[in-house]
Swiss-Prot record:
It comes from the Eukaryota. The keyword Transcription regulation applies. Keywords: Chromatin regulator, DNA replication, Nucleus, Repeat, Repressor, Transcription, Transcription regulation, WD repeat. Pfam families: CAF1C_H4-bd, WD40. This is Probable histone-binding protein rbbD. It comes from Dictyostelium discoideum (Social amoeba). GO terms for biological process: chromatin remodeling; DNA replication; regulation of DNA-templated transcription; response to mercury ion. The keyword S-adenosyl-L-methionine does not apply. One of its GO terms (molecular function) is histone binding. It is found in: Nucleus. The lineage of its organism: Eukaryota, Amoebozoa, Evosea, Eumycetozoa, Dictyostelia. Belongs to the WD repeat RBAP46/RBAP48/MSI1 family. GO terms for cellular component: nucleus. PANTHER family: WD40 REPEAT FAMILY.
Length: 423
C-alpha cells in the first residue's frame, strides 16, 4: 500500500514539474538548473560580482556543501555562476530541456562550475560567509564543532588523503545543529545553535595564528528543546534572535547576560527558522512545522502581526530580501519557494483570486521535485535567488519583471498561472 501511494505521489510530482516547465517562459526572466553530484543542504551567495567588457554575463559565486553517503568524501564547495547582465543578452525565453534553463547567455557552455572543493568531515549542515571578509566561511558539521575555513589558504582541488583541515575549530556545543549567523556589524562575531538546546557565541578575531581551536566566548541557555535557528539583528549589533522545537521565539541582548530578554510562544509546532528585516528594525519573521510564516513586531511580541499561509508542509527557511523592505521568501518540505510582498496584505481580491492564495503571495517557485533544503537571495541582483533541494538540484532563478512591477493585469495573469502549478 505504501509503495502504491509513493508511486502515485511520484507521478503527481512529475506531472507538476512538467506543468512548471511549460509555464517557465511566462513566469521567469531566468532559470538555470544544475545537477550536483550529491545533494547540498546549504547555499549562500558570495557578495562579489565581476563584469567583463563585451561579455553578456557577469561572474558571481555561491558556496555549497555535500551530503554524501557514509563511504564518500564530503566537501565544502565554491561554485562560479555566469549570469546574464541585462535583458538584451538573454536569448528567447523558452525552457531548454537539454540545458535545463530559461534565459540562456549565448555560447557559455557551463553556467555553473565548481571551482573549489575543500575536504569536510561529514556533511555540511550549513555554510555561511563572513560579511566583512568573503574568504572566511563558517560551517555547521555533523559533530558538535563549528569549522572556520579561509578559502585563500586551501587549494582549489581537495587533497587526496581526504583530511579535513579547517583553519579553526570552534568548541562549546555538545551536539550538532544547523543554525549559524555572522554579525553584520561586528567582524568575527559568530553565533551557532544546536540540538543540545544552547547557543554559542565566538569572536574568531580573538584566536591567534597558532590556535587550532577556540572556546565559546559566551553560551546562552533558555530553550528547553532543540534550537533550530539563530540570527543576528541587522541594525543593533548586540541583539539576536533564536527559535526552537519548544515553539519559542527568543530575543537576546549580549549586554544583559546569557538569558533572553523576550520570550514568546510563536507557533503551534516547532519553529525552524527566523529572519530579521534589514530595513525595519522591529520586524522579524518565523517559519514553523505548522506550515505558516509569522510576522512579529519586537515592540509587542505578545501579538502576532500577521500569518503568511500558503505552504502545504513544514517551513524550514525564511529570509527577508536584502533589496526590498516588504519582500521575503520561504521554503520547505512542500518543494516550493514562496515569495511574499507584505505591502499587498489586505488588498481586495475576488473569489477566484482568493482561491489561488492571499494577496501578499507574490510568486511560487515550483522547479524542485524534493524538499528544499536552503535558498539565498542574491545580494548583487535584486529578485535573483539560488535554491537547493534533496533532488541534487541547484537552481538559480529570477521571476519575470512584470510579476513584481505590475500590480494590475500582468500580476493577476501571472499569479493565476502560477497558482495552477502550486495546486
Amino acid at each position: 500500500m505504501t509503495t502504491q501511494m509513493e508511486d502515485v505521489e511520484e507521478k503527481v510530482i512529475n506531472e507538476e514539474y512538467k506543468i512548471w516547465k511549460r509555464h517557465t517562459p511566462f513566469l521567469y526572466d531566468m532559470v538555470i538548473t544544475h545537477a550536483l553530484e550529491w545533494p547540498s543542504l546549504t547555499v549562500a551567495w558570495l557578495p562579489v560580482k565581476t563584469s567583463q567588457p563585451n561579455k553578456p554575463y557577469s561572474i558571481e559565486k555561491v558556496i555549497l556543501g555535500t551530503h554524501t553517503s557514509d563511504e564518500e568524501q564530503n566537501y565544502l564547495m565554491v561554485a562560479k555562476v555566469h549570469l546574464p547582465v541585462d535583458e538584451a543578452s538573454i536569448e528567447s525565453l523558452k525552457y531548454d530541456d537539454t540545458k535545463g534553463e530559461v534565459g540562456g547567455i549565448g555560447n557559455v557552455s557551463e553556467k555553473i562550475e565548481i571551482i573549489q572543493k575543500i575536504n569536510h568531515e561529514g556533511e555540511v549542515n550549513r555554510a555561511r560567509v563572513m560579511p566583512q571578509n568573503h574568504s572566511i566561511i563558517a560551517t555547521k558539521t555533523v559533530s558538535s564543532e563549528v569549522y572556520i575555513f579561509d578559502t585563500t589558504k586551501h587549494p582549489l582541488e581537495p587533497t587526496p588523503d581526504g583530511k579535513c583541515s579547517p583553519n579553526l575549530k570552534l568548541t562549546g556545543h555538545k551536539k550538532e545543529g544547523y543554525g549559524i549567523s555572522w554579525n553584520p556589524r561586528k567582524e568575527g562575531h559568530l553565533l551557532s545553535c544546536s540540538d543540545d538546546q544552547s547557543i554559542c557565541m565566538w569572536d574568531i578575531s580573538a584566536a591567534s595564528k597558532s590556535d587550532s581551536t577556540l572556546d565559546a566566548l559566551n553560551i546562552y541557555n533558555g530553550h528547553t528543546s532543540i534550537v533550530e535557528d539563530v540570527a543576528w539583528h541587522y541594525i543593533h549589533d548586540t541583539f539576536f534572535g533564536s527559535v526552537g522545537d519548544d515553539k519559542k521565539l527568543m530575543i537576546w541582548d549580549t549586554r544583559t547576560g546569557t538569558k533572553p530578554i523576550h520570550v514568546v510562544e510563536a507557533h503551534n509546532s516547532e519553529v525552524n527558522c527566523l529572519s530579521f528585516n534589514p530595513f525595519c528594525e522591529f520586524l522579524v519573521a518565523t517559519g514553523s512545522t505548522d506550515k505558516t510564516v509569522a510576522l512579529w513586531d519586537m515592540r509587542n511580541l505578545g501579538n502576532r502581526l500577521h500569518s503568511l499561509i500558503s505552504h502545504t508542509d513544514e517551513v524550514f527557511q525564511v529570509q527577508f530580501s536584502p533589496h526590498n523592505e516588504t519582500v521575503l521568501a520561504s521554503c520547505g518540505s512542500d518543494r516550493r519557494v514562496n515569495v511574499w510582498d507584505l505591502s499587498r496584505i489586505g488588498e481586495e481580491q475576488n473569489n477566484e483570486d482568493a482561491a489561488d492564495g492571499p494577496p501578499e503571495l507574490l510568486f511560487i517557485h515550483g522547479g524542485h521535485t524534493s524538499k528544499i533544503s536552503d535558498f539565498s537571495w542574491n545580494p548583487n541582483d535584486p529578485w535573483s535567488i539560488a535554491s537547493v533541494a534533496e533532488d541534487n538540484i541547484l537552481q538559480i532563478w529570477q521571476m519575470a519583471e512584470n510579476i513584481y512591477n505590475d500590480r494590475e493585469d500582468d500580476l493577476e495573469n501571472s499569479k493565476v498561472t502560477n497558482a495552477q502549478i502550486g495546486e
